[in-house]
C-alpha cells in the first residue's frame, strides 16, 4: 500500500484493518477497527480529513476525496 504523509500528518490505520497492497492512503485518513480497503482504492485526505469508521468496507477501485467546500468525509 502507498502511504503518503504531508506536513506531519500521516494516515492512521487500526491494527485490525485490512488494506490491500494496491491501495493509496494520502495525508489525513483514519481507518477504524475491522474495516477493509480493497484493491486500487484511493483515499485522498489532502484537503480535508477522511474517517472510515469501524466495520466499514470500501470496495475495489473506489476514490474518496474530500472538498474544502463540503468539509470532511465520515463513514
Model-derived features: where do they sit?
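Extreme N-terminal tail/first-helix region
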Residues: 1-15
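A structural motif detector for beta-strand N-caps
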Residues: 11, 16-19, 23, 29, ...
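A contiguous binding-surface segment within folded domains or other stable secondary-structure elements
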Residues: 66-75
Amino acid at each position: 500500500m502507498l502511504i503518503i504523509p504531508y506536513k506531519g500528518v500521516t494516515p492512521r490505520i487500526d491494527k485490525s484493518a485490512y488494506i490491500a497492497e494496491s491501495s493509496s492512503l494520502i495525508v489525513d485518513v483514519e481507518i477504524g477497527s475491522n474495516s477493509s480497503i480493497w484493491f486500487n482504492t484511493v483515499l485522498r485526505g489532502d484537503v480535508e480529513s477522511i474517517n472510515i469508521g469501524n466495520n466499514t468496507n470500501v470496495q475495489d477501485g473506489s476514490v474518496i476525496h474530500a472538498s474544502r467546500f463540503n468539509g470532511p468525509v465520515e463513514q
